[in-house]
Design a protein with these regions (language model features):
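Bacterial N-terminal signal peptides
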Residues: 9-19
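Zymogen propeptides/activation segments of proteases
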Residues: 26-114, 379-380, 408-429, 434-438
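Acidic/His/Gly-enriched intrinsically disordered linker/tail segments
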Residues: 154-163, 186-190, 205-270, 276-322
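Beta/coil-rich, acidic/histidine-enriched accessory regions frequently appended to metallopeptidases
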Residues: 282-460
Length: 460
């Protein structure tokens, strides 16, 4: 779901991972489910997104693999102008035809070029068999659109299915008055790319964590419409939420698209699709860290924690070095603190899958050495990152040490005078859990607020 960052609240939960299931799951299921949504043509819808009048006479309009639904009166009606009506005589508004063209382009990239699996068929729901239904609705400022699974997909007495079919609901005009600072066509394009990605995700595993669902959907926006760069507004917020874990189901998950960008730069674009295709077969079910871990290992990489430590190191100077495809457009990541010049240790408390960037002052000497101690058993990393030259055209030199079981770590950079900036990166890369919390809709991670001690000194 694409949410307007100016209006945060309950809508930030990913509708893509809401179940088409009763409000309370069977004992033993790891998920807590909310009341399922209904198509606008079905009544009533708990979110109050039902149409208040019948569909327009020519609705739905279908082309290729999509059907677009609309009404002809009331607040939910799109602009009904049909300037080419004399030519085609179809009675379909130009806006609806524009949505169908956008849909065809999105499908050509996501399913064609990138090779993602076709959506799960919804049968005859909404119109023609097997087509993805798109409903135009007055959504307003709270959200740009959403994808939702259909109700009634739970066979009686059986466990919850992991592969589901669903539908899209998009705004009926993306008026600049309601979405200030954006452009209507661009909003339609990136929202369709994002929400349709959720539909595809549902046919891999509808119950992966929201952070994976949203971050990969934002990543998909930029694959389909690279020139719009709408995702950068999420990145600008992401850099300030350094205490929020990468795996958190929170507003930060949209900006976590940078994790996917980093993986793609390292392993190629197929790794994102591969993480989804492996999701159904990883354990515990629905644990997205395991899905990424499986794809990374299959691509020749190391474990998730090691890769996260490398990612954290590379974020320190992501505007340099070319490790992020559009890194020069990213904001500089704020340093959270400075290490004392006299070598006194600094104490930090880090949540799982978080890191802190610390300024290191080393104007001279043969080398600079950083030391850190992580709690025993906690996967952790320590890096020194030095930038030579300016932040957009400079060169980066780094040293990283990853300890899967915690303990003492030491890294060293030679000739510190050559660097414009030196940063120590302290990483809590641990992802161990103890079950799933039905109340919080998140895993019970075991290593939050883990104490670290770090220091740095120059070698004369």
């Amino acid at each position: 779901m694409r949410a307007n960052l100016r209006l945060v609240g309950p809508l930030l939960a990913s509708i893509a991972v809401l179940a088409a299931a009763p409000a309370v799951a069977r004992a033993g299921d790891q998920w807590a489910f909310r009341q399922p949504l209904a198509r606008p043509t079905d009544h009533p819808d708990p979110a109050r997104h039902s149409y208040t009048v019948p569909e327009a006479p020519h609705s739905p309009a279908c082309s290729g693999r999509f059907c677009v639904h609309w009404v002809a009166e009331g607040l939910d009606a799109p602009d009904l102008a049909d300037e080419n009506g004399v030519e085609d005589g179809d009675g379909v508004p130009d806006y609806v035809e524009r949505v169908l063209k956008v849909a065809a382009h999105v499908h050509a990239i996501e399913n064609g070029k990138l090779g993602w699996r076709e959506p799960r068929s919804d049968g005859h729901r909404g119109g023609l068999e097997g087509k993805t239904d798109v409903y135009l609705k007055e959504l307003g400022q709270q959200l740009f659109g959403y994808a939702a699974p259909d109700r009634g997909q739970i066979p009686k007495g059986l466990r919850l299915p992991r592969r589901l079919h669903g539908y899209l609901v998009l705004d009926n005009d993306y008026s600049p008055f309601q979405y200030p600072g954006t452009k209507p066509l661009a909003d339609l394009e990136v929202t369709f790319a994002h929400e349709y990605c959720h539909i595809l995700q549902m046919n891999y595993d509808a119950y992966q964590d929201a952070w994976m669902a949203e971050s990969t959907a934002v990543w998909m926006e930029d694959q389909v419409y690279n020139g719009i760069n709408d995702y950068l507004r999420y990145v600008r917020r992401w850099v300030h939420l350094y205490n929020t874990p990468l795996t958190a189901n929170s507003i930060r998950e949209y900006g976590t698209t940078v994790w996917n960008e980093w993986l793609v730069r390292r392993y190629g674009r197929d790794i994102i699709r591969d993480a989804w295709s492996r999701a159904l077969h990883t354990r515990p079910g629905g644990f997205s860290v395991a899905s990424y871990d499986s794809a990374i290992r299959a691509a020749g990489g190391s474990e998730f924690g090691d890769e996260f430590a490398r990612f954290a190191r590379d974020v320190a100077e992501w505007r340099s070095g070319g490790l992020f495809r559009e890194g020069r457009r990213y904001p500089d990541v704020p340093r959270q603190n400075s290490l004392p010049r006299d070598g006194e240790p600094l104490r930090l408390w880090l949540n799982h899958t978080t890191f802190q960037l610390l300024r290191v002052h080393a104007p001279g000497g043969r080398a600079v050495i950083a030391r850190a101690v992580a709690p025993r058993g906690v996967a952790a990393g320590l890096a020194l990152v030095g930038r030579i030259g300016d932040e957009r055209r400079g060169r980066v030199v780094s040293r990283l040490l990853f300890r899967p079981h915690g303990g003492a770590m030491t890294v060293r950079l030679a000739q510190p005078r050559r660097f414009e900036r030196i940063t120590a990166v302290v990483v809590n890369a641990d992802t161990r859990t103890e079950g799933f919390s039905a109340r919080r809709l998140d895993w019970n991670y075991l290593t939050d607020i883990a104490p670290f001690r770090v220091e740095a000194r120059a070698v004369r």
